[in-house]
Swiss-Prot record:
UniProt protein name: Lactosylceramide 4-alpha-galactosyltransferase
The enzyme's E.C. designation: 2.4.1.228
PANTHER family xrefs: LACTOSYLCERAMIDE 4-ALPHA-GALACTOSYLTRANSFERASE (PTHR12042:SF17), LACTOSYLCERAMIDE 4-ALPHA-GALACTOSYLTRANSFERASE ALPHA- 1,4-GALACTOSYLTRANSFERASE (PTHR12042)
Highest taxon, organism lineage: Eukaryota
Compartments in which it is found: Golgi apparatus membrane
Comment on protein domains: The conserved DXD motif is involved in enzyme activity.
Family annotation (Gene3D superfamilies): 3.90.550.20
Gene label: A4GALT
A GO CC term assigned to this protein in UniProt: Golgi membrane
Class of the enzyme per the UniProt entry, highest EC level: transferase
Length: 327
């Protein structure tokens, strides 16, 4: 009886939590990489820039994988005038030096990229999320890491404004002309993998209130895509997303803007494609979401004609060179 119960528990955990993230990265990587002699992006002017771009790592991991590296590099290259801030919970605070990892070494080559520690208690301070975060500390929930990420991104947008991107995006175009915008994933749901909002926008305040008032950490997406969809429907007084694309200063962009390939078709990123088709395929796309939850661990040859390999080569060439050397 015990053996069977233990086996079932393990299988449930495996199904809910998923396989280890790095199952596809079993090779040994060097801790440092020499910066390439490429024309570097123009460093941004000092002082607070209104268009900061934020990436988040809410786990304690400090070794960005190649897709993470490509996300940040592609954002840095398309936004040379912006600060690209990579906030990682596992980084030490104070004046401690950064951990020695290939990803951190490579991303440090870009003058507009900063790797900074993420202090969640400080981020949530003076927001409706502070009490929720204190309460959730002592309990186990199946989706706590993604839920922490959901909370962190809306707190960042509320407190600082700018652009938030998940670490499984490849950025194709400059995003600075987008303000108070989020992307539509499908006919029925919005997605917060990309957010662009002004600081202290009322929509983000409503998101934080809904996060706490209707909290349920046991349903996948309830605090993320479903939350944004709920709040947008209330914001616009609509029942269906089809009724309105924009209202009261907040705009939703169609799926091709950020989610041109639906999550159900994630394997298309690993299929060969004619390079001449790329511009047509993504003519209406700002950034490509790769659905890492589905695709993680899927291997591809960096030099192949796979769609993902071609996107790496074009939009994050420094990461792509590292992949060719070490994959």
């Amino acid at each position: 009886g015990f053996k069977f119960t233990f086996f079932v528990s393990i299988m449930i955990y495996w199904h809910v939590v998923g396989e280890p993230k790095e199952k596809g990265q079993l090779y040994n990587l060097p801790a440092e990489i020499p910066c390439p002699t490429l024309a570097p992006p123009t460093p941004p002017s000092h002082g607070p820039a209104p268009g900061n771009i934020f990436f988040l790592e809410t786990s304690d991991r400090t070794n960005p994988n190649f897709l993470f590296m490509c996300s940040v590099e592609s954002a840095a290259r398309t936004h040379p005038e912006s600060h690209v801030l990579v906030l990682m919970k596992g980084l030490p605070g104070g004046n401690a030096s950064l951990p020695r990892h290939l990803g951190i070494s490579l991303l440090s080559c870009f003058p507009n990229v900063q790797m900074l520690p993420l202090d969640l208690r400080e981020l949530f301070r003076d927001t409706p999320l502070a009490d929720w975060y204190a309460a959730v500390q002592g309990r186990w929930e199946p989706y706590l890491l993604p839920v922490l990420s959901d909370a962190s991104r809306i707190a960042l947008m509320w407190k600082f404004g700018g652009i938030y991107l998940d670490t499984d995006f490849i950025v194709l175009k400059n995003l600075r002309n987008l303000t108070n915008v989020l992307g539509t994933q499908s006919r029925y749901v919005l997605n917060g993998a990309f957010l662009a909002f002004e600081r202290x926008h009322e929509f983000m305040a409503l998101c934080m209130x809904d996060f706490v008032d209707h909290y349920n950490g046991w349903i996948w997406g309830h605090q993320g895509p479903q939350l944004l969809t709920r709040v947008f429907k209330k914001w616009c007084s609509i029942r269906s997303l089809a009724e309105s694309r924009a209202c009261r200063g907040v705009t939703t962009l169609p799926p091709e803007a950020f989610y041109p390939i639906p999550w159900q078709d994630w394997k298309k990123y690993f299929e060969d494609i004619n390079p001449e088709e790329l511009p047509r395929l993504f003519s209406a796309t700002y950034a490509v979401h790769v659905w890492n939850k589905k695709s993680q661990g899927t291997r591809f040859e960096a030099t192949s004609r796979a769609l993902l390999a071609q996107l790496h080569a074009r939009y994050c060439p420094t990461t792509h060179e590292a992949m060719k050397m070490y994959l």
